[in-house]
From Swiss-Prot:
GO molecular function terms attached to this record: structural constituent of ribosome
Record's keyword annotation contains Cell membrane: no
Keywords: Ribonucleoprotein, Ribosomal protein
A single cellular component GO annotation: ribonucleoprotein complex
Tree of life domain: Bacteria
Protein name, as recorded: Large ribosomal subunit protein bL33
One annotated GO biological process: translation
Protein species of origin: Synechococcus sp. (strain JA-3-3Ab)
Disulfides per UniProt: none
Pfam families linked: Ribosomal_L33 (PF00471)
NCBIfam families named among the record's database cross-references: PRK00504.1, PRK00595.1, rpmG_bact
């Protein structure tokens, strides 16, 4: 029998202000990778993390 998929998946968090902010330290978009339990957290994650491109703490949203 085949083994079932685990509940944990790898997701990518992207800075929401890097796309719109023109006055930032360096060009580009900051991304973090992390894992989440798809059974406990079905909605998309939103975490406040440090963005080195914007040089401050910003909201990072889960992307596909």
């Amino acid at each position: 029998m085949a083994k079932a998929k685990g509940a944990r998946i790898i997701i990518t968090l992207e800075c929401t202000e890097c796309r719109t902010n023109v006055n930032k330290r360096s060009p580009g978009v900051n991304r973090y990778t992390t894992t989440k339990n798809r059974r406990n957290t079905t909605a998309r994650l939103e975490l406040k993390k440090f963005c080195p491109k914007c040089n401050r703490h910003t909201v990072h949203k889960e992307i596909k």
